[in-house]
């Protein structure tokens, strides 16, 4: 719930700056692009409302989808950043199979691909306690890791703004 609140604040700020925002959800056995890059605050909030929580965490699939969207945005002259908000460890691999070890390797592979493309961003851990492995993932991406246990939406929003300010 707090992650959704933080995203709503970020959307309002992005709208004020006339930035484009895209939403990628990763759950179950894969990732879905809920919304391609848009400036529509109403449409983005509507899609955000459809975002379910819980279940498997196909983190690598989410990172792959975010990377693909970022590359498309770059091709259109935009300067994309990736803000990953999650409260879970990768437990579904790129093939959609529940395999924690392979899922972690796949997530690192995608993190290195994001780093290789020179994309900025950050990893925000929204869990009640720091989630083991997300700091390693951020290191692989060469982006900040922000563990925000029990943080409210404004704290998450401020952290994202600070980390992405130079993007």
Q: Language-model features: where?
A:
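Von Willebrand factor
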Residues: 1-37, 62-65, 69, 78-85, ...
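Charged, alpha-helix-enriched surfaces in structured cytosolic catalytic cores
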Residues: 2-6, 39, 43, 54-61, ...
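Secondary-structure boundary motif
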Residues: 16, 50-53, 72-76, 116
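Short beta-strand-loop
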Residues: 19-50, 70-73, 95-98, 130-140, ...
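N-linked glycosylation sequons
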Residues: 56, 64-68, 75-76, 112-115, ...
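VWA/integrin I-like adhesion module and closely mimicked acidic/polar interface patches used
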Residues: 88-140, 146
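C-terminal helix of von Willebrand factor
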Residues: 137-167
């Amino acid at each position: 719930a707090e992650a959704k609140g933080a995203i709503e604040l970020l959307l309002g700020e992005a709208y004020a700056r006339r930035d484009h925002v895209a939403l990628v959800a990763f759950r179950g056995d894969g990732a879905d692009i809920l919304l391609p890059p848009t400036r529509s605050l109403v449409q983005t909030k509507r899609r955000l409302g459809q975002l379910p929580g819980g279940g498997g965490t196909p983190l690598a699939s989410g990172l792959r989808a975010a990377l693909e969207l970022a590359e498309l945005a770059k091709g259109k002259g935009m300067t994309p950043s990736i803000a990953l908000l999650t409260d879970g460890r990768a437990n579904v691999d790129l093939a959609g199979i529940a395999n924690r070890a392979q899922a972690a390797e796949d997530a690192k592979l995608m993190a290195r691909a994001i780093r290789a493309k020179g994309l900025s961003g950050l990893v925000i851990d929204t869990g009640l306690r720091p989630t083991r492995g997300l700091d390693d993932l951020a290191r692989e991406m060469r982006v900040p890791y922000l563990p925000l246990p029990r943080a409210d939406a404004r704290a998450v929003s401020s952290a994202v703004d600070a980390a992405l300010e130079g993007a």
